[in-house]
């Protein structure tokens, strides 16, 4: 397996990072190393490529950005650990379904290993849940065998803006965050812990 570079981008506007993902993916070659980007975004709603406007109930002047990822509308904001996967999935011998399950399982493993939290998935509703409340959302895009976008883990943030939308297209979906269970939750630690679990699973799948 090739090297995977980690880039900690800090706090960055969503639009800028989205544009950078598109550029990286469109210009990469078979020799380009895979990258994982760790980032935090100012408040923004992002709409998936099949997103329906009626799922945004009231934006409260929070910007709305249309993207090409899978899924419906979600919210990003400070205190949320976002991890983007810029991978050559063909080179890593991953199909789209395997990539999704690896992204999900890494989050489940992280929450169990570091926080003793038993998380789960729900059939037909991608994401990670604790007691049927969503703690992590994912949306990916694969273009010509290359992935981008990723997972957002609610860590230590204001969850109120999720009530302004139907998160991921589900009316009344309850959200939670790591800080509900672990007051000292820190996004930098979560990003590093998650990435370690993801890379371990990826290596084991090769």
UniProtKB/Swiss-Prot annotation:
It is found in: Cytoplasm. InterPro entries: aa-tRNA-synth_II/BPL/LPL, BPL_LPL_catalytic, Octanoyltransferase, Octanoyltransferase_CS. It catalyses: octanoyl-[ACP] + L-lysyl-[protein] = N(6)-octanoyl-L-lysyl-[protein] + holo-[ACP] + H(+). The keyword Oxidoreductase does not apply. Substrate binds at residues 69-76, 137-139, 150-152. One of its GO terms (biological process) is protein modification process. It is an enzyme of class 2 (transferase). The record marks 134 as: Lowers pKa of active site Cys. One of its GO terms (cellular component) is cytoplasm. Belongs to the LipB family. This is Octanoyltransferase. It comes from Francisella tularensis subsp. novicida (strain U112).
């Amino acid at each position: 397996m090739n090297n995977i570079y980690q880039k900690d981008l800090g706090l960055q506007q969503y639009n800028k990072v989205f544009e950078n993902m598109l550029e990286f993916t469109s210009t990469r070659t078979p020799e380009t190393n895979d990258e994982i980007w760790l980032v935090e975004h100012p408040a923004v709603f992002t709409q998936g490529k099949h997103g329906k406007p009626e799922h945004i109930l009231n934006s409260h002047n929070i910007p709305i950005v249309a993207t090409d990822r899978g899924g419906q509308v979600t919210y990003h904001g400070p205190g949320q650990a976002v991890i983007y996967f810029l991978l050559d999935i063909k080179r890593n011998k991953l199909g789209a379904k395997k990539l999704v399950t690896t992204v999900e399982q890494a989050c489940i493993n992280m929450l169990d290993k570091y926080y003793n939290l038993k998380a789960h998935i729900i059939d037909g509703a991608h994401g990670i849940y604790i007691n049927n409340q969503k703690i992590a959302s994912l949306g990916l895009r694969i273009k010509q065998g290359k992935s981008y976008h990723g997972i957002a883990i609610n860590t230590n943030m204001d969850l109120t803006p999720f009530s302004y939308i139907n998160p991921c297209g589900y009316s009344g979906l309850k959200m939670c965050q790591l800080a509900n269970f672990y007051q000292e939750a820190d996004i930098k630690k979560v990003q590093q812990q998650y990435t370690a679990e993801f890379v371990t699973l990826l290596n084991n799948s090769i």
